[in-house]
């Protein structure tokens, strides 16, 4: 049996852009994404702290420092400046669960890394 478990999280990131006309995804600063163990194309769930919206999309690695941009139709669910939580889950069996520690990255309002746990 497997369970869906938290794999990684970027906590309280700030939306820097919302691009309705781009093919859907979330663009995340590559250094930040890698620290959070997020991969290009990986499914993530976005929770908007400001408005309560919750939606799924996939990761695109961004080149700009601190960039967090929601693209495509999901851009309607956020506003620039909103605070979001970016979550990734993984299916794990009991042994994997016991050995796993989620990657949790806390950031400030400029998406600069405060803490990695």
Swiss-Prot record:
<dbReference type="InterPro" id="IPR003190">
    <property type="entry name" value="Asp_decarbox"/>
</dbReference>
<comment type="pathway">
    <text>Cofactor biosynthesis; (R)-pantothenate biosynthesis; beta-alanine from L-aspartate: step 1/1.</text>
</comment>
<comment type="subunit">
    <text>Heterooctamer of four alpha and four beta subunits.</text>
</comment>
<dbReference type="GO" id="GO:0005829">
    <property type="term" value="C:cytosol"/>
</dbReference>
<keyword id="KW-0865">Zymogen</keyword>
<feature type="binding site">
    <location>
        <position position="57"/>
    </location>
    <ligand>
        <name>substrate</name>
    </ligand>
</feature>
<keyword id="KW-0566">Pantothenate biosynthesis</keyword>
<keyword id="KW-0456">Lyase</keyword>
<feature type="active site" description="Schiff-base intermediate with substrate; via pyruvic acid">
    <location>
        <position position="25"/>
    </location>
</feature>
<feature type="modified residue" description="Pyruvic acid (Ser)">
    <location>
        <position position="25"/>
    </location>
</feature>
<comment type="similarity">
    <text>Belongs to the PanD family.</text>
</comment>
<protein>
    <recommendedName>
        <fullName>Aspartate 1-decarboxylase</fullName>
        <ecNumber>4.1.1.11</ecNumber>
    </recommendedName>
</protein>
<dbReference type="Pfam" id="PF02261">
    <property type="entry name" value="Asp_decarbox"/>
</dbReference>
<feature type="active site" description="Proton donor">
    <location>
        <position position="58"/>
    </location>
</feature>
<keyword id="KW-0704">Schiff base</keyword>
<comment type="function">
    <text>Catalyzes the pyruvoyl-dependent decarboxylation of aspartate to produce beta-alanine.</text>
</comment>
<dbReference type="GO" id="GO:0015940">
    <property type="term" value="P:pantothenate biosynthetic process"/>
</dbReference>
<keyword id="KW-0963">Cytoplasm</keyword>
<dbReference type="InterPro" id="IPR009010">
    <property type="entry name" value="Asp_de-COase-like_dom_sf"/>
</dbReference>
<dbReference type="GO" id="GO:0006523">
    <property type="term" value="P:alanine biosynthetic process"/>
</dbReference>
<keyword id="KW-0670">Pyruvate</keyword>
<dbReference type="GO" id="GO:0004068">
    <property type="term" value="F:aspartate 1-decarboxylase activity"/>
</dbReference>
<feature type="binding site">
    <location>
        <begin position="72"/>
        <end position="74"/>
    </location>
    <ligand>
        <name>substrate</name>
    </ligand>
</feature>
<keyword id="KW-0068">Autocatalytic cleavage</keyword>
<keyword id="KW-0210">Decarboxylase</keyword>
């Amino acid at each position: 049996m497997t369970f869906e478990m938290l794999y990684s999280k970027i906590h309280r990131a700030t939306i820097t852009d919302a691009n309705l006309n781009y093919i859907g995804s979330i663009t995340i600063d590559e250094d930040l994404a890698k620290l959070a163990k997020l991969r290009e194309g990986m499914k993530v769930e976005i929770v908007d702290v400001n408005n309560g919206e919750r939606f799924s999309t996939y990761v695109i690695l961004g080149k700009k420092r601190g960039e967090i941009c929601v693209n495509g139709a999901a851009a309607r669910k956020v506003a620039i400046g909103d605070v979001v939580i970016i979550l990734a889950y993984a299916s794990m069996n009991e042994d994997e669960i016991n050995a796993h520690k989620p990657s949790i990255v806390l950031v400030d309002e400029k998406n600069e890394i405060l803490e990695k746990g």
